[in-house]
């Protein structure tokens, strides 16, 4: 069963009709229901709006919208329930409110130069039966008014811990502070103070500095919804440090020190502040008499073995002192190589031949084979020569034994054959008596 909700004026009329006499009561009720039928109802209509977030000093836009409007009256009220606009009429005398659009389905109003005091709920009302109401919340963002960075000491010494503070004042909501040293993010400790809906944030950073931090920026960067881009401030660190000492040998260029050579060393010292004094000393001994000192340079001419030792360069400034050592060792002078001789050449040639054999194994094998062949041939030749010698000896002995017989045969053909026979007999008798041989061999 549907119920009809009467406006407050209709409810009063109904109460009066109930107190009237019965005949008049019926007439008043009929008149009342007829009047209620002429008032628009909220059936099918929907009033809606959206919240607004705006940065201080900018423009906020408030829109009251109606779906399926039947030309009902729309009005806008401020947080104090004062009417800003009734339809297209502005009862409130605040020129910052301006009508942007008015129709049966929308009432759109702008608020310029928004301040923190404008924050709150704004109400949209639709005059239906029953009336509808919706509200929008305006949130005002306030960026930090001032960003300050404060460093405990303008000039620090390496190894010292310093305090750095960064303050973001009067923001809404509270600001988030981030710390950077160069490109490295660091972690600080923040404290928030609230005053009259505004926030002041102070972040503290404890930083131990080193010589590498000299000239490096310390950056305080804020993050806030009212800030676009990077809002930051920075301070450059100034760090003092003791000297850094390095010894460089400028002569001899090859780096090997020998007797008779010269030595030149240069001491490089870098510090902050710049070292005011650079000195050379010889550790555990006196500096050679022939050594020459000229500022950061040490020059020793005509080196000898007595110059061996450790040479130290010392540098100092107001922060401290440092040193670097150079150990000198003098080598013997280079020996003179004698010119090559015939013997040396022969030895070199022999060595080269051996290396060639070792490098190529096949050449060695062929040489061995050739050596074996020559030995065999030499042996054969020797045997042949020996055989020929033996043959000659045998032939010589043979001819020597048969020499008389040869002459005897030659003599047989002669007239004195008898004498030849006598010679043969004597020859066969041997050679024991040389006189007998002379007697028969005429």
From Swiss-Prot:
Topological domains, Extracellular: 45-374
Leader peptide range in chain numbering: 1-44
Membrane spanning residue stretches: 375-395
Top-rank taxon: Eukaryota
SUPFAM superfamilies: Immunoglobulin (SSF48726)
A Pfam family of this chain: C2-set_2
Residues modified as Phosphothreonine: 422
Covalent S-S links between cysteines: 64-124, 166-220, 267-313
Keywords, sorted A to Z: Apoptosis, Cell adhesion, Cell membrane, Developmental protein, Differentiation, Disulfide bond, Glycoprotein, Host-virus interaction, Immunity, Immunoglobulin domain, Membrane, Phosphoprotein, Repeat, Signal, Spermatogenesis, Synapse, Transmembrane, Transmembrane helix, Tumor suppressor
Domain Ig-like C2-type: residue ranges: 144-238, 243-329
Domain-related comment: The cytoplasmic domain appears to play a critical role in proapoptosis and tumor suppressor activity in NSCLC.
PANTHER family recorded: CELL ADHESION MOLECULE 1, IG-LIKE DOMAIN-CONTAINING PROTEIN
Protein's name in the database: Cell adhesion molecule 1
Biological source species: Homo sapiens
Gene that specifies this protein: CADM1
């Amino acid at each position: 069963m549907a119920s009809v909700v009467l406006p407050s004026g209709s409810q009063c009329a109904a109460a009066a009709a109930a107190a009237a006499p019965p005949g008049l009561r019926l007439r008043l009720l009929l008149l009342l229901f007829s009047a209620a039928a002429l008032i628009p109802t909220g059936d099918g209509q929907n009033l809606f709006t959206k919240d607004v977030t705006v940065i201080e000093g900018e423009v906020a836009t408030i829109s009251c919208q109606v779906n399926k409007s039947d030309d009902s009256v729309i009005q806008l009220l401020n947080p104090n329930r004062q009417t800003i606009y009734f339809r297209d009429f502005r009862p409130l005398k605040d020129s910052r409110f301006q009508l942007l659009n008015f129709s049966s389905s929308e009432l759109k109003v702008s608020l310029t130069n928004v301040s923190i005091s404008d924050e709150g709920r704004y109400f949209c009302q639709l005059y239906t039966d029953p009336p509808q109401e919706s509200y929008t919340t305006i949130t005002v963002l306030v960026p930090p008014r001032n960003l300050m960075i404060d460093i405990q000491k303008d000039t620090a010494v390496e190894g010292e811990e310093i305090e750095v503070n960064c303050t973001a004042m009067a923001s809404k909501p509270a600001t988030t502070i981030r710390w950077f040293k160069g490109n490295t993010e660091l972690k600080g400790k923040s404290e928030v103070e609230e005053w009259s809906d505004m926030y002041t944030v102070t972040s503290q950073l404890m930083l131990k500095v080193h010589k590498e931090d000299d000239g490096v920026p310390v950056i305080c960067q804020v993050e806030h919804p009212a800030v676009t881009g990077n809002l930051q401030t920075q301070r450059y660190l100034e760090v003092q440090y003791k000297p850094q000492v390095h010894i460089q040998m400028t002569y001899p260029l090859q780096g090997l020190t020998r007797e008779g050579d010269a030595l030149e060393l240069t001491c490089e010292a870098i510090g902050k502040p710049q070292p005011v004094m650079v000195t050379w000393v010889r550790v555990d001994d006196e500096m050679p008499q022939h050594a020459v000192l000229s500022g950061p340079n040490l020059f020793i001419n005509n080196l000898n073995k007595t110059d061996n030792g450790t040479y130290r360069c010392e540098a100092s400034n107001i922060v401290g002192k440092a040193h670097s050592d150079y150990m000198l060792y003098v080598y013997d002078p280079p020996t003179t190589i004698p010119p090559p001789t015939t013997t040396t050449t022969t030895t070199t040639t022999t060595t080269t031949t051996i290396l060639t054999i070792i490098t190529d194994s096949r050449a060695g094998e062929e040489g061995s084979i050739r050596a074996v062949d020559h030995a065999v041939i030499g042996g054969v030749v020797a045997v042949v020569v020996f055989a020929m010698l033996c043959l000659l000896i045998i032939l010589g002995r043979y001819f020597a034994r048969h020499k008389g017989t040869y002459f005897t045969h030659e003599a047989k053909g002669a007239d004195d054959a008898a004498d030849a026979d006598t010679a043969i007999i004597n020859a066969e008798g041997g050679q024991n008596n040389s006189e007998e041989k002379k007697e028969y061999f005429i």
